[in-house]
């Protein structure tokens, strides 16, 4: 059985990147929550 995590910089950015977060209402809520917590990094 292969491992489930097969790293890819492109897929990481597309799925979890800043622009991907801004694209949906839920993603914007995620960013707002992370800003409220004072996260240094908001997204991948």
From Swiss-Prot:
BP-aspect Gene Ontology terms: translation
Gene3D superfamilies noted in UniProt: 1.10.287.3980
InterPro entries: Ribosomal_bL34, Ribosomal_bL34_CS
Record bears the keyword Cell membrane: no
Key words, A-Z: Ribonucleoprotein, Ribosomal protein
The keyword Ribosomal protein belongs to this UniProt entry's keyword annotation: yes
GO terms under cellular component: ribonucleoprotein complex; ribosome
GO molecular function, one term: structural constituent of ribosome
Domain of life: Bacteria
Family listed: Belongs to the bacterial ribosomal protein bL34 family.
NCBIfam families: rpmH_bact
Protein name stated in the entry: Large ribosomal subunit protein bL34
Organism: Rhodopseudomonas palustris (strain HaA2)
Gene assigned in the entry: rpmH
